[in-house]
Amino acid sequence: MNQPHVQRKYIFVTGGVLSGVGKGITAASVGAILKARGLNVSVQKCDPYLNVDAGTLNPAEHGECFVTCDGAETDLDLGHYERFLDIEVTQQSATLAGRVLRDLIANERAGKFLGETVQMVPHFTNAIKTEFANSSPGSDIHIVEIGGTVGDYEGLSFVEAIREFSAEVGKENCAFIHLVYVPYLSASKEYKTKPAQNAMRDLRSFGIVPDVIAARSDDLAGESVMKKISMFGGVPLESVINLPNADSIYQVPLTIEKSHIDQLLAKKLNLPLGKPDMRVWKDIYNKITKHYKQTVKIGIVAKYLDNEDTYYSVVESLRIAAWHQDVGLEINWIDAEKVGKNLKQLDKYDGLLIPGGFGTRGVEGKIAAAGWALENNKPYLGLCLGLQAAVIAAARIGGVKNATSAELDDSAKDQVIYLMPDQ
């Protein structure tokens, strides 16, 4: 492992009980709070998938593929990092087990291990630790989110890697935040901590005691629940914070800041903290809760409608744009495969947005919707395939009735969009 910068501090965010409890939002929020106190923060997401990148993952199952400024196809959590921290993340901010394993095998085939028996421990874990050390050099604090839940078979090597890394760089330079889910049973009208207890025990079995436990719940769980988590988690009560569901993810930094988590981390990591400047988050909160006099209705013509996370960054960008224009926003989803049968339904929208996609399914519907926007002088934003749809629609309206693109039909005569030589 390359020797990490000794002055840099590391915060590892793990989760227990189940996935999807908000590790990414929590990591981004903690980073935002520390940045508001004057620190230079970087973030990294580690996923235990054997995929090389997120570009081929099913968006209906996994959510959107977030593309970084240097072209890396990554997890949607990196979008949270960019929006919350106001930074540009790069391919160094995304680590998938498949890519690390591919590179490890390539090095073994090239003889770089000099005949050693290459194993998950120490070789794979060493490679993971190198990813931690090399990602975003120069930051004061590097936050690493470990995907999945502690105890998952596929994620064992990542948890072992953060344990080893903590010992190597010094425990005074590492902090651990563990998210647990606390379910509410309506029958008995109480929150149950047993799943959280088991999740904390799983983490301790790896030799890791969390510095902060974040208890996710539907509503405020109450001090008695926090005391129970504190006792079974082996951490002081002030190190247990309750994170109930929020109306908007942009409220989370303010919620976490009230828990003084930044002061807890500063004490553990010996961090210099300036006075927090949370004005931007308070301003966002005011925009979220404001009653707007005017509401803009936007129709999104898309085909991956099984999972709203498929177009997460598109939706968030629309919301942020609406706040800046001081208007409310109503988004309606329109099935690209059905819209062509009833274009009249589009009359009620103030504008259309057609995002990217792959394959020919639903393309004709997108082209029809784009053509309707052109002919009715409606504001239109086409992203990726959505822009192709607009160009094709314009060509067809202009008389090229069979207009298409090389991506959709590489043998067509009337291609109005071509592929670049390196595509």
Go through the PLM ranges and name each one.
Residues G274-D277, L381, V400-E407:
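Acidic/polar loop patches that form or flank catalytic/metal-binding clefts of enzymes
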Residues D77-D86, K338, A389-Q423:
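Pocket-forming structural segment of enzyme catalytic cores
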Residues L374-A390:
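Repeat-solenoid scaffold signature
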Residues L50-V52, Q388-V391:
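Short gly/pro/ser/thr-enriched loop/turn and capping motifs at secondary-structure boundaries
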